[in-house]
Amino acid sequence: MIEVEITQEMIDEALFRASQVPALKNSDTNNHGTKIAALSDLMVQKTWGGRIVSDISYDFDWISPKYYLFEIKSKERNVEPKPWYNCSVKEYNTQQKCDYYLFTSIYGDYSRGWILGYLKKDEFFDKAVFFNKGDVDPDPRGDKYVFPSNCFNVKVEQLNCK
């Protein structure tokens, strides 16, 4: 896991990028997540280079310097991510044409974020556990998280990170 300091310049750019995105049909966050996603894209690009393409592709958000296609999945958090926290791909998003899923978290005040790690798409689904909307995470280390939508999940501790 890599912690990243978020600058005001990154926040301003993310807010602009988010303002250009139409309302999302299946948003669990009333499109607040669009801001978090834009900030996550920038955080990854500023840390590892590559190119953000989320504005032109539904299937992936970032092209790495080695030309791999990454779909970035982001969550807002009010605490530093723990190894047992879930990294999720919603059931309706499983057809995206990416090489990897990359997971990030953004602290609620936008002061910092974390690149949690990544998995190849097929490896993600080999390791993932499926939960239905309303299911409670059975992991005894957690706080009985209730899943807001049907999704596939791995734990942070299962991810690869540079």
Predicted regions and their residues:
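Nucleic-acid endonuclease domains
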Residues: M1-Y68, K73-K162
